[in-house]
């Protein structure tokens, strides 16, 4: 029997509401590492159809070099990380489940050519989201993904997969996830030989830019909420050198 899109949407809505009630938990990931990798690859394919990827420029090489320097200092080695630059003026960086990490051109322009420390902290933060499985935990609460991956529900079309890419780009993390990724990213940067104070400089630049633009919230801040307590916590972690290797 052919099911209509409205039937598919209703099924997804019901499952998304019922799943947390059945499990009693919104923070557990129901995706295996293999499923995370598969989901990330599909999301990356969709994103790279929408945005032009910078492959061979000095900026692209810089991003790959910093990413490769961070990787030996993390504990989750079972995913194939990649580091790419997307040609968009948005000030943002995103990481997908399973390892794809994207730095947006607008972010590189804001940081300039010399502050590798700040860029390393930002990329470490994004790696922290992957390592902490933050996106996978959120996506697990949306049974649309599980239906696509596990059951092949009729109606899961390329349009659904394109929407999945948009979900990755606009995924808003919880306060706890942001603090966890800050801790992880600062630790990765520190042990890779970068100055973790680069993260504070980045936060301060974002705040100044936001004030100059009349309070208009930049893309990174929309998906990575920033507040005074978060900045203070990062400053305290750096001051106390409370870095944890591989976490």
Annotate each PLM feature:
Residues 1-23:
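Sec-dependent bacterial lipoprotein signal peptides
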Residues 22-247:
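A Zn2+-metalloprotease active-site environment signal
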């Amino acid at each position: 029997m052919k099911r209509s899109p409205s039937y598919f949407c209703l099924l997804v809505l019901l499952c998304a509401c019922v799943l947390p009630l059945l499990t009693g938990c919104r923070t557990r990931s129901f995706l295996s590492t293999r499923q995370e990798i598969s989901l990330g690859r599909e999301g990356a394919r969709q994103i790279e159809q929408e945005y032009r990827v910078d492959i061979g420029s000095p900026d692209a090489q810089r991003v790959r070099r910093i990413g490769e320097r961070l990787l030996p200092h993390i504990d989750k080695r079972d995913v194939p990380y990649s580091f790419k630059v997307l040609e968009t003026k948005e000030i943002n960086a995103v990481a997908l489940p399973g390892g794809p990490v994207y730095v947006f051109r607008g972010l590189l322009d804001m940081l300039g050519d010399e502050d590798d420390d700040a860029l390393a902290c930002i990329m470490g933060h994004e790696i922290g989201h992957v390592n902490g499985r933050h996106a996978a935990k959120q996506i697990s609460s949306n049974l649309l993904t599980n239906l696509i991956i596990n059951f092949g529900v009729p109606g899961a079309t390329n349009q659904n997969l394109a929407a999945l890419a948009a979900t990755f780009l606009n995924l808003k993390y919880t306060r706890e996830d942001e603090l966890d990724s800050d801790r992880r990213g600062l630790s990765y940067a520190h042990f890779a030989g970068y100055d973790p104070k680069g993260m504070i400089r980045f936060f301060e630049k974002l705040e100044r830019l936001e004030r100059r633009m009349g309070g208009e919230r930049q893309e990174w801040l929309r998906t990575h909420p920033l507040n005074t307590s978060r900045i203070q916590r990062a400053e305290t972690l750096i001051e106390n050198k409370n870095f944890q290797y591989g976490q």
